[in-house]
């Protein structure tokens, strides 16, 4: 869903255009747009928008958590309508930033259309011009200036639907650098099986050390310490990374039961405080001494 408003927030800003796209059980897509033709029609607009939002099992927006949802909630309060029941809300802006910011920088929706989805809108309007177009319509009654605003709103919700589809089955279409970011995003969401599949694909494509590191992190999170150790050990041969040595030292000590190798990594520097490193070194030296003692006849 997406809104067009008379301002950037606050009690005086009004939603004058609401757009929502949803899918029916047969896979058909439906787009509904609600236009506030005059201020006195705000109540029915909010009522119908509330019906559409309440019927959704998942809300999808682009910066909607910070802007669209709060302004709709404020307008409902101002019109003495009850608050809507909470719904799961996927804000694609946060997903896009995690996935694409390293490659694209700014993550405007039109940027994603061009560089991720591969298309460019035709005639469009900058968001900063939208309120003045609506003000002109209220003064003159001429709807022609609103045509591009309505199309802009429709494009926004259609693009969100396309992004949801892309992120659902992304591996063949995402650039290599975005695969690593997607794996990290799945890991943060604790979708570890999906994270592992994406990380495996990134490694298979030869994305590089970043893919190997995230795959090791995911393996560790899944409890597959043997796989994590393999990936971290391969990285440690190429990288001078104190944090990586710390992860590997822990795995050698507690999983592989190789305190000598863990001690070597600790002495090489693990980025810990001096006190923590000293405790780790002392503990490992005791384990090595006990192991030697048990081997003596």
Residue spans for each PLM region:
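TPR-repeat structural position
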Residues: 143, 192, 225, 258-259
């Amino acid at each position: 869903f997406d809104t067009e408003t008379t301002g950037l927030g606050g009690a005086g800003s009004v939603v004058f255009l609401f757009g929502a796209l949803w899918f029916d059980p047969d896979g058909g897509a439906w787009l509904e747009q609600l236009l506030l033709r005059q201020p006195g029609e705000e109540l029915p607009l909010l009522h119908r928008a509330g019906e559409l939002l309440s019927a959704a099992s998942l809300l999808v927006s682009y910066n909607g958590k910070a802007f669209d949802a709060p302004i709709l909630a404020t307008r409902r309060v101002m019109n003495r309508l009850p608050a809507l029941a909470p719904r799961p809300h996927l804000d694609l802006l946060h997903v896009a930033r995690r996935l694409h910011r390293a490659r694209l920088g700014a993550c405007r929706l039109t940027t994603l259309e061009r560089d991720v989805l591969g298309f460019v809108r035709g005639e469009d309007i900058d968001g900063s011009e939208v309120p003045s177009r609506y003000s002109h319509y209220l003064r003159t009654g001429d709807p022609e200036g609103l045509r591009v605003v309505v199309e802009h709103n429709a494009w926004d919700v259609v693009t969100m639907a396309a992004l949801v589809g892309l992120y659902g089955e992304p591996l063949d279409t995402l650039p290599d650098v975005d695969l690593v970011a997607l794996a990290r995003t799945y890991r943060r969401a604790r979708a570890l099986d999906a994270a592992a599949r994406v990380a495996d694909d990134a490694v298979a494509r030869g994305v590089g050390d970043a893919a190997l590191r995230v795959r090791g992190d995911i393996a560790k999170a899944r409890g597959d310490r043997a796989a994590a150790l393999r990936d971290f050990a391969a990285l440690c041969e190429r990288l001078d990374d104190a944090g990586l040595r710390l992860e590997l030292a822990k795995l050698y000590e507690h999983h592989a039961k190789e305190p000598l190798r863990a001690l070597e990594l600790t002495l090489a520097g693990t980025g810990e405080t001096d006190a923590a490193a000293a405790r780790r070194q002392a503990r490992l030296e005791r384990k090595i001494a006990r192991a030697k003692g048990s081997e003596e006849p």
